């Protein structure tokens, strides 16, 4: 251990690192160099003084100097050593010293961040590497996941800033003097496509020739370039549509290797052109004479698709060559428009949504005698502990909903969700959150039905909302009240009188499948009227356990109560499918935690799995503690799909009967208004086939979607084209909604 480094550095536990490290990891450095040691980060920006309010999910994009202790891997002999690191944003350098006292001396090592790559490790939540353009590499380890996330975020912002400066400060090379209108002697001119192909992929040559005549780039020409980019991108979208709408088999099919390569190459070309256009803008801005007037803002002229090229509400429109083709025909279900469409977020108004009338009631599997041969064939290919992420499971075990919609169903009690922020004290708010958390699983898991939802396709999204009458949301009365307000709940929404929009709170929900391998989903919900939102990302890891299958929900969520300046970090339990050869059933298991670093309250929740002999099914216990005094303020016991008993520190008890708890129906857009990649429209053919008990037909539709996803993933890998998400942005190890409520509404702690 180096001098000047307090011993407390080595005492950070795993749980504290994950849940509590954030509040103390970042401190303002307004006065002097009083930096925290032992992995604590000192920041020169006053904005970081918010502490733990949103650091796990929000980072400002301004330049911020950071310094603090990190462990650096030296070599096999020496191993890991503590070193004091300084991020010099102005110079674009990452420097390190033996300890903080020697920071006034020459640094022991320096890395240029321009062109560098910052890579968090997949093996653990503490390690990351900084790979400089020169080939030099620093392998570093933070005290905990939150500290690593902060360092990675600051380094990435600094790297991006100085990398973009390269394009601005170094003008592009002079263009070569050759003419596109050459004689017919070049190899390209000799490879003329057939007339039929030209009519299929029509290109506006007259406009392209007009661009070739412009020898000099004047300021006004940036607008013209943008217009041409818009035109080219519109043609590329049309190309993708035409390829995807070809029949799946025949002389020219949508899965033809040459056409798939053409689609991927055109996508990569447009991405490259967008980057070049951005460099032109930077170059033009650097040549502007004189300083800009104060208050002037610069808006980049991003290429935009003309309105005529947009398809309203994402609905498919027939081509001019096929005017009588019905929208619902399988050939016209152009599902894989993912390349361009998935990159453009869409603001969906809750006014476009209607109360859900879809009845996807699930029947339990019961005995699986008829499917035993299918299951035995599958089991013969599996090994104990094998990862099932890439294993295709039989269709008959599927629910009629996507995993993304399952996450939405966890929000089916919006009155309890909104009521959290009504808690009068931090203790009351924590208890209300635990109550909401425990009551969410019975609807999210549809009781304990032994079926699994669809695995979402990458780029798949799901949108919905709930309207909750303000009169039905619990007031600020303490949750420890013995009045059975929840067991004698208000009537179900369909029985309640019609409420105007102004008399209701609106809870909006959006989910997106942001990664395929590993399968990661991001979801976000907010109630803007009450200034509260929840952001979460979940990686589902499934393993074969012999006669059962276990699914681990890796990831975490954060509930932000902006009215109180509080954040509640939580995790999710594991799920197990038992007795898969006889009568399958599902249970939840494992320990999860809820923590609020600001108030010092935490909750430990245990989902008990059934022992081999005796014991109850679906049992859950929980304790809510005040960490500063280690006092238990509430205990919970019961079954997560039946009855829960809350016992408070004053001796009072409350029972929550989940069978009597009202479920608010979600509001969704009609199917014809949904985008091609929204869950219900994407899986429509599979769902319809399952409703009709056409298992073979459902399997074929499901296989078609999965094969298309694999093909596109392979082509993206071959062409080096990264996947771009639509609504969520990767920050450190997590995924954050692109327009979270906390970015628009400042956190204002209550007096």
From Swiss-Prot:
Biological source species: Mus musculus
Domain of life where this protein originates: Eukaryota
Gene3D superfamilies in alphabetical order: 1.10.287.2720, 2.40.160.120, 3.30.70.3490, Pleckstrin-homology domain (PH domain)/Phosphotyrosine-binding domain (PTB) (2.30.29.30)
Main function: Plays a role in regulating ADIPOQ and FABP4 levels in differentiating adipocytes and is also involved in regulation of adipocyte triglyceride storage. Weakly binds 25-hydroxycholesterol. Interacts with OSBPL9 to function as lipid transfer proteins.
Protein name as annotated: Oxysterol-binding protein-related protein 11
Record SUPFAM superfamilies: Oxysterol-binding protein-like (SSF144000), PH domain-like (SSF50729)
InterPro entries linked: OSBP_sf, Oxysterol-bd, Oxysterol-bd_CS, PH-like_dom_sf, PH_domain
GO cellular component entries: Golgi apparatus; late endosome membrane
